[in-house]
Amino acid sequence: MEFTQKSGLRKLPRPVWGLVACILLVAAGYGLYWNFLAGQFRNGLERWAEVRRAEGYKVDYGPVEVAGFPFWLRVVMGQPVLSKSGEKQSWNWRGPALTISARPWRVTHTKAQAPGRHLVTVTTQARVRTLDINAGSLNVSLKWAVSSGLPLEMRIEGKDISYRSAPVAGLGRRTETLSLHAEVTGTPPKSLGAAVMSQWRDDGGTVEIRSLNVRHGPMEIDGDGTIALDGDLQPQAAFSMGVRGFMDAVDGLQAAGVIKPRKADVMKMVLAVLSGGKADAKGKLLKVPVSIQDEIIYMGPVVVGRVPYMNWPTGG
């Protein structure tokens, strides 16, 4: 019986043996290719961290594991930390284990997953503000510029995001869904240095917010817009936003003591007029322009907040 099996193997046509040999060679070659990319992926992460550190950021993370063979390159990074200190403000982010994935044949397109606890601290001369966030799911897709290691396109999808304390008193401690699609236009900047960002701005570079949707507490906000840099390299922006649930939001602000009952009544009257009675299947709809100028956020002509001061690294 053993002799018959060996004879059968010997009698296989040469083309079949050639095909088997090709398959084995391709498999071995792909294995070498994957391992090479895994090393490059890990080295690329280290180079990215080194560049950010040179720009003045603090970058730290725990053990790094690379897995996913054969169809994925998957990096799992423990205890990531990213922070930046400046004269006017400092900020710090600490996140849960971060998983970064890419297809071996499409390494400039990555996906990151970071469900769990995120701790963000922003320190200014006036106050320290902390956001303690727990994300049920948080997925980020990035398309990278090979020359700079900076993203050209970003998509963010988050669900079931809760906060230890409400980001805005009276509007609840849970974001049901969050989505963002943004693209960088113009020649991609090669670094985040002040001189480079100034040149990118002068060449007409912008960040286009293709879509933004947030469902938080009683409100749903969606819209699009453009972000650019002003003469001091601070963000300026113009958005067209649609807001639903604004009446319930005013009630929440009043109940939390953020606004007085009389002011709440006036706000409701103004919002009713601005909405013009417009409604769709989801309820009353308020279309309002939102802008950022001189670090101040405006909703129409009304000041609603401030944006952090951007400290760009000096040099190129």
Per-region residue spans from a language model:
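N-terminal beta-strand/beta-hairpin edge segment
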Residues: 54-166, 212
